[in-house]
Protein backbone atom coordinates (compact mmCIF):
# COMPACT_ATOMS: atom_id res chain seq x y z
CA UNK A 1 0.00 0.00 0.00
CA UNK A 2 1.21 3.48 -0.93
CA UNK A 3 2.28 5.69 2.00
CA UNK A 4 -0.30 8.38 1.20
CA UNK A 5 -3.09 5.79 1.01
CA UNK A 6 -1.88 4.32 4.32
CA UNK A 7 -2.03 7.80 5.86
CA UNK A 8 -5.58 8.30 4.59
CA UNK A 9 -6.57 4.88 5.93
CA UNK A 10 -5.26 5.89 9.36
CA UNK A 11 -7.39 9.05 9.26
CA UNK A 12 -10.56 7.27 8.15
CA UNK A 13 -10.09 4.28 10.48
CA UNK A 14 -9.87 6.63 13.47
CA UNK A 15 -12.84 8.83 12.55
CA UNK A 16 -16.59 8.52 12.94
CA UNK A 17 -17.30 11.91 11.39
CA UNK A 18 -16.25 11.69 7.75
CA UNK A 19 -17.84 13.85 5.06
CA UNK A 20 -17.26 13.19 1.37
CA UNK A 21 -17.44 15.87 -1.32
CA UNK A 22 -17.34 14.43 -4.84
CA UNK A 23 -17.49 15.32 -8.50
CA UNK A 24 -17.56 13.72 -11.93
CA UNK A 25 -14.35 11.73 -11.37
CA UNK A 26 -16.22 9.53 -8.89
CA UNK A 27 -18.38 8.15 -11.69
CA UNK A 28 -15.82 7.83 -14.50
CA UNK A 29 -14.90 4.34 -13.29
CA UNK A 30 -18.58 3.47 -13.73
CA UNK A 31 -18.29 4.45 -17.39
CA UNK A 32 -19.80 7.95 -17.12
CA UNK A 33 -17.47 10.46 -18.84
CA UNK A 34 -16.14 13.48 -16.97
CA UNK A 35 -17.10 16.76 -18.65
CA UNK A 36 -13.65 18.30 -18.41
CA UNK A 37 -11.28 15.38 -18.99
CA UNK A 38 -9.50 15.04 -22.33
CA UNK A 39 -12.09 12.55 -23.60
CA UNK A 40 -14.97 14.21 -21.73
CA UNK A 41 -18.05 15.95 -23.04
CA UNK A 42 -16.41 19.36 -23.49
CA UNK A 43 -13.87 17.92 -25.91
CA UNK A 44 -16.44 16.27 -28.16
CA UNK A 45 -17.81 18.07 -31.21
CA UNK A 46 -21.43 19.17 -31.10
CA UNK A 47 -23.53 21.72 -32.96
CA UNK A 48 -23.39 23.92 -29.83
CA UNK A 49 -21.04 23.83 -26.82
CA UNK A 50 -22.33 21.45 -24.08
CA UNK A 51 -22.65 24.30 -21.58
CA UNK A 52 -24.97 26.06 -24.06
CA UNK A 53 -27.06 22.94 -24.65
CA UNK A 54 -27.35 22.37 -20.90
CA UNK A 55 -28.42 25.93 -20.15
CA UNK A 56 -31.84 27.16 -19.07
CA UNK A 57 -31.98 29.45 -22.10
CA UNK A 58 -31.37 26.54 -24.51
CA UNK A 59 -34.00 24.47 -22.67
CA UNK A 60 -36.50 27.29 -23.18
CA UNK A 61 -35.59 28.18 -26.78
CA UNK A 62 -34.47 24.85 -28.28
CA UNK A 63 -36.51 22.47 -26.13
CA UNK A 64 -36.55 19.49 -28.49
CA UNK A 65 -32.81 19.74 -29.20
CA UNK A 66 -32.19 20.02 -25.45
CA UNK A 67 -33.97 16.73 -24.83
CA UNK A 68 -32.25 14.97 -27.75
CA UNK A 69 -28.86 15.93 -26.28
CA UNK A 70 -29.95 15.21 -22.71
CA UNK A 71 -31.19 11.70 -23.54
CA UNK A 72 -28.10 10.91 -25.61
CA UNK A 73 -25.42 12.29 -23.27
CA UNK A 74 -26.75 12.78 -19.73
CA UNK A 75 -28.54 9.49 -19.09
CA UNK A 76 -26.40 6.46 -18.23
CA UNK A 77 -29.05 4.12 -16.87
CA UNK A 78 -26.93 0.98 -17.19
CA UNK A 79 -24.07 2.42 -15.12
CA UNK A 80 -23.34 0.61 -11.85
CA UNK A 81 -21.68 1.89 -8.65
CA UNK A 82 -17.91 1.38 -8.42
CA UNK A 83 -15.61 0.75 -5.45
CA UNK A 84 -15.76 4.41 -4.36
CA UNK A 85 -19.57 4.45 -4.17
CA UNK A 86 -19.56 1.11 -2.34
CA UNK A 87 -16.94 2.17 0.22
CA UNK A 88 -18.86 5.34 1.08
CA UNK A 89 -22.08 3.37 1.57
CA UNK A 90 -20.19 0.90 3.77
CA UNK A 91 -18.77 3.71 5.93
CA UNK A 92 -22.25 5.16 6.37
CA UNK A 93 -23.64 1.78 7.50
CA UNK A 94 -20.77 1.59 10.01
CA UNK A 95 -21.66 5.03 11.39
CA UNK A 96 -18.39 6.56 10.19
CA UNK A 97 -19.63 8.69 7.29
CA UNK A 98 -22.15 11.46 7.95
CA UNK A 99 -22.92 12.62 4.41
CA UNK A 100 -22.03 12.43 0.74
CA UNK A 101 -22.15 15.80 -1.00
CA UNK A 102 -22.06 15.32 -4.75
CA UNK A 103 -21.97 17.40 -7.90
CA UNK A 104 -23.08 14.33 -9.87
CA UNK A 105 -26.61 13.78 -11.13
CA UNK A 106 -26.43 10.03 -11.84
CA UNK A 107 -27.89 8.62 -8.61
CA UNK A 108 -25.09 6.05 -8.24
CA UNK A 109 -24.46 6.86 -4.57
CA UNK A 110 -28.05 5.87 -3.73
CA UNK A 111 -27.76 2.80 -5.96
CA UNK A 112 -24.77 1.74 -3.85
CA UNK A 113 -26.83 2.11 -0.67
CA UNK A 114 -25.93 5.60 0.59
CA UNK A 115 -28.78 7.31 2.45
CA UNK A 116 -27.60 10.84 3.29
CA UNK A 117 -26.74 12.13 -0.19
CA UNK A 118 -26.85 15.86 -0.92
CA UNK A 119 -27.14 16.36 -4.67
CA UNK A 120 -25.96 19.90 -5.39
CA UNK A 121 -26.88 19.69 -9.07
CA UNK A 122 -30.02 17.55 -8.75
CA UNK A 123 -30.64 14.10 -10.21
CA UNK A 124 -31.66 12.59 -13.55
CA UNK A 125 -33.77 10.10 -11.57
CA UNK A 126 -36.29 12.79 -10.55
CA UNK A 127 -38.48 14.57 -13.09
CA UNK A 128 -41.58 16.72 -12.71
CA UNK A 129 -44.27 18.17 -14.92
CA UNK A 130 -43.73 21.93 -15.18
CA UNK A 131 -47.49 22.46 -15.27
CA UNK A 132 -49.08 20.16 -12.66
CA UNK A 133 -46.01 19.00 -10.72
CA UNK A 134 -46.58 15.26 -11.28
CA UNK A 135 -43.48 13.14 -10.60
CA UNK A 136 -41.94 10.91 -13.26
CA UNK A 137 -39.06 8.45 -13.06
CA UNK A 138 -36.12 8.59 -15.44
CA UNK A 139 -37.57 5.84 -17.64
CA UNK A 140 -40.29 8.23 -18.83
CA UNK A 141 -37.64 10.61 -20.15
CA UNK A 142 -35.45 7.85 -21.58
CA UNK A 143 -38.31 6.22 -23.49
CA UNK A 144 -39.83 9.45 -24.80
CA UNK A 145 -39.27 10.96 -28.22
CA UNK A 146 -39.02 14.67 -28.82
CA UNK A 147 -40.29 16.69 -25.85
CA UNK A 148 -41.53 14.47 -22.99
CA UNK A 149 -45.10 15.38 -22.04
CA UNK A 150 -47.18 14.77 -18.94
CA UNK A 151 -50.70 13.35 -19.17
CA UNK A 152 -51.87 16.95 -18.59
CA UNK A 153 -49.88 18.16 -21.60
CA UNK A 154 -47.16 19.94 -19.64
CA UNK A 155 -43.45 19.43 -20.28
CA UNK A 156 -41.67 16.96 -18.00
CA UNK A 157 -38.45 18.63 -16.81
CA UNK A 158 -35.53 16.82 -15.14
CA UNK A 159 -34.69 17.82 -11.57
CA UNK A 160 -31.22 18.83 -12.74
CA UNK A 161 -29.66 22.24 -12.16
CA UNK A 162 -28.95 23.66 -15.61
CA UNK A 163 -26.47 26.42 -16.37
CA UNK A 164 -28.04 29.80 -15.44
CA UNK A 165 -30.19 28.13 -12.76
CA UNK A 166 -29.46 28.53 -9.06
CA UNK A 167 -28.63 25.74 -6.64
CA UNK A 168 -31.17 24.65 -4.04
CA UNK A 169 -30.57 26.83 -0.98
CA UNK A 170 -31.67 24.12 1.47
CA UNK A 171 -29.26 21.58 -0.01
CA UNK A 172 -26.46 24.15 0.10
CA UNK A 173 -27.20 24.99 3.74
CA UNK A 174 -27.14 21.32 4.72
CA UNK A 175 -23.87 20.80 2.82
CA UNK A 176 -22.28 23.74 4.65
CA UNK A 177 -23.46 22.31 7.97
CA UNK A 178 -21.92 18.89 7.32
CA UNK A 179 -18.62 20.31 6.03
CA UNK A 180 -18.34 22.71 8.97
CA UNK A 181 -18.88 19.86 11.47
CA UNK A 182 -16.64 17.31 9.71
CA UNK A 183 -13.60 15.73 11.33
CA UNK A 184 -12.24 14.22 8.10
CA UNK A 185 -13.24 15.84 4.80
CA UNK A 186 -12.46 13.86 1.65
CA UNK A 187 -12.67 15.63 -1.70
CA UNK A 188 -12.78 13.15 -4.55
CA UNK A 189 -12.97 13.23 -8.32
CA UNK A 190 -13.43 16.97 -8.74
CA UNK A 191 -11.25 19.72 -10.16
CA UNK A 192 -13.11 22.22 -7.94
CA UNK A 193 -13.77 24.65 -10.79
CA UNK A 194 -17.59 24.62 -10.70
CA UNK A 195 -18.91 27.38 -8.45
CA UNK A 196 -20.75 27.88 -6.16
CA UNK A 197 -20.32 24.20 -5.28
CA UNK A 198 -16.51 24.39 -5.14
CA UNK A 199 -16.73 27.30 -2.70
CA UNK A 200 -18.19 24.98 -0.04
CA UNK A 201 -14.69 23.77 0.88
CA UNK A 202 -13.93 27.06 2.64
CA UNK A 203 -16.36 26.07 5.42
CA UNK A 204 -14.19 23.16 6.58
CA UNK A 205 -12.70 23.90 10.00
CA UNK A 206 -10.63 20.75 10.53
CA UNK A 207 -7.07 19.75 9.68
CA UNK A 208 -7.73 16.36 8.09
CA UNK A 209 -8.48 17.30 4.51
CA UNK A 210 -7.81 14.58 1.94
CA UNK A 211 -7.93 15.04 -1.83
CA UNK A 212 -8.17 12.10 -4.24
CA UNK A 213 -8.16 13.19 -7.87
CA UNK A 214 -6.48 12.33 -11.14
CA UNK A 215 -4.19 15.29 -11.69
CA UNK A 216 -4.00 16.27 -8.03
CA UNK A 217 -5.34 19.65 -6.72
CA UNK A 218 -4.72 19.11 -3.02
CA UNK A 219 -1.54 21.07 -2.47
CA UNK A 220 -3.25 24.39 -3.22
CA UNK A 221 -5.91 23.53 -0.63
CA UNK A 222 -3.43 22.70 2.12
CA UNK A 223 -4.57 19.07 2.22
CA UNK A 224 -3.11 16.71 4.82
CA UNK A 225 -3.21 13.94 2.20
CA UNK A 226 -3.19 14.31 -1.59
CA UNK A 227 -3.52 11.23 -3.79
CA UNK A 228 -3.22 11.43 -7.56
CA UNK A 229 -5.16 8.50 -8.98
CA UNK A 230 -8.53 6.95 -9.84
CA UNK A 231 -10.72 7.24 -6.77
CA UNK A 232 -12.28 3.78 -7.02
CA UNK A 233 -8.90 2.07 -7.03
CA UNK A 234 -7.77 4.21 -4.09
CA UNK A 235 -10.86 3.75 -1.94
CA UNK A 236 -10.93 0.00 -2.50
CA UNK A 237 -7.76 -0.08 -0.37
CA UNK A 238 -9.23 1.82 2.59
Where on the chain are the PLM-derived regions?
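Conserved catalytic core of sirtuin-type NAD+-dependent deacylases
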Residues: 1-238
Amino acid sequence: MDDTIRRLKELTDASDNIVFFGGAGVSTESGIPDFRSVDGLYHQKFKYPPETMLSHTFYETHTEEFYDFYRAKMLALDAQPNAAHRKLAEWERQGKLKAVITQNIDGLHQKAGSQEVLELHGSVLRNHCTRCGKFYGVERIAESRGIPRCTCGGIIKPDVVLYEESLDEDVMARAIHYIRQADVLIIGGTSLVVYPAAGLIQYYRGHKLAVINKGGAGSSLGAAVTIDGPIGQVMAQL
